[in-house]
């Protein structure tokens, strides 16, 4: 017997603004029959295939320490550099640039200071997590 992940929860000072940012980053959407709105204490996003959900939950305290869990993003149709530029335009900031000639990543912060990483794109390295062909 096993379990499956129902959704990923993210503590937030403002669940609504975080849901707007991450919807733009990931191409996720809200439930049109139960849209996220300012003042909602919980805001839910769905992946395009509805296989993953992210729940932003308002909490009273600010983020105080480094995340123990974070998203590693692999751009699908832009280079790593172009994706970093796009995310900067959405309100993210660069925390650490760890790019190397053979790959590396950029650690960024979302508008509330949560870390996430931007890896090399699929265009640059293929899909390293793909299952090997039989």
For each predicted feature, which ranges?
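Nucleotide-cofactor and metal-assisted catalytic machinery
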Residues: 39-40
């Amino acid at each position: 017997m096993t379990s499956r992940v129902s959704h990923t929860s993210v503590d937030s000072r403002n669940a609504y603004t975080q849901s707007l940012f991450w919807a733009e980053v990931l191409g996720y959407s809200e439930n049109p029959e139960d849209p996220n709105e300012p003042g909602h204490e919980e805001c839910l996003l769905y992946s395009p295939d509805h296989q993953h959900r992210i729940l932003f939950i308002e909490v009273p305290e600010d983020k105080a320490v480094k995340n123990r869990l974070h998203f590693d993003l692999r751009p699908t149709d832009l280079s790593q550099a172009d994706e970093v530029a796009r995310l900067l335009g959405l309100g993210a900031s660069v925390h650490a640039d760890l790019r190397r000639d053979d790959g590396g990543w950029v650690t960024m912060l979302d508008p509330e200071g949560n870390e996430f990483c931007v890896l090399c794109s699929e265009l640059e390295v293929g899909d390293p997590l793909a299952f090997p062909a039989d």
